[in-house]
A protein has these predicted regions:
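Core SAM-dependent methyltransferase catalytic element
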Residues: 185-187, 191-209
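C-terminal alpha-helical "lid/dimerization" subdomain adjacent to the S-adenosyl-L-methionine
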Residues: 137-185, 191-193
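Short catalytic micro-motifs in class I SAM-dependent methyltransferases
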Residues: 107-108
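A conserved beta-strand element that flanks and buttresses the S-adenosyl-L-methionine
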Residues: 104
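Conserved class I S-adenosyl-L-methionine
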Residues: 1-36, 50, 152
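Class I SAM-dependent methyltransferase SAM/SAH-binding core
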Residues: 42, 48-92
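A short glycine-rich, Lys/Arg-flanked "PGG" loop and its adjoining helix->strand segment in the class I
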Residues: 118-130
Length: 209
């Protein structure tokens, strides 16, 4: 039996409260890995579909997965039949291996437990084509920049403490974030783009070491 929808209460207001803080990062991500028309793109933890919409507009064939039916309902309302949506955990992706040209996940790794985090990355690697790329967007725990960095770091700490998944955030932080996770998976980071005053980074990773 699937657990209670963890985002049932926030789904209705997510795009108004949370998405504005992520919009700039999503735009930068498109510059970091420009999508090609015809690409098969998978968004793991697709939420309300705002990230997928950008790839649809670029002419990609887009698939999204999420653990929240409430969030997927919002994604369906936004995208209709322009994206294939699946209710599933990231550590059990229902796709054949080597299918996708780009596999992306945004602000997901810090929310899950360490074992689920590694399983999710392994599944992303499995479903990616050998010549594809993995794109990770998540918190960064290095030095901060300007006034925005410290402000967002403090805000993030408060939000995560009351979000219901602080243990995941804490273990993600002590594991050195995305660099630690992909390093443990035997992968290497090809490019890091620091955004949000150093509080978030976009990482490009090859699916094969």
């Amino acid at each position: 039996m699937r657990a209670e929808d963890p985002y049932r209460r926030i789904a209705a207001v997510y795009d108004r409260l949370i998405e504005p803080m992520q919009a700039e990062v999503r735009s930068v991500a498109l510059d970091v890995v420009p999508p090609h028309p015809g690409w098969q793109v998978l968004d793991v933890g697709c939420g309300t579909g705002t990230g997928m919409a950008r790839y649809v507009e670029a002419g990609c064939t887009v698939t999204g997965v999420d653990v929240s039916e409430s969030m997927l309902e919002r994604a369906r309302a936004r995208l209709g039949d322009r994206a294939a949506l699946h209710l599933t955990d990231g550590d059990t992706l229902p796709f054949d291996g080597g299918r996708f040209d780009l596999v992306t996940t945004s602000m997901v790794l810090h929310e899950v437990a360490a074992d689920a985090r590694m399983a999710l990355v392994a599944e992303m690697v499995r479903v990616a084509r050998p010549d594809s790329r993995l794109l990770f967007i998540d918190f960064r725990f290095g030095s901060l920049r300007g006034w925005k960095g410290p402000m967002l770091r403090a805000l993030s700490e408060v939000v995560e403490r009351f979000s219901g998944h602080y243990s995941g955030y804490r273990s993600f932080k002590t594991s050195d974030g995305v660099p630690g996770v992909v390093g443990k998976a035997g992968l290497g980071i090809e490019r890091e783009k620091i955004v949000a005053g150093g509080n978030v980074a976009i990482y490009v990773v090859a699916p094969k070491p």
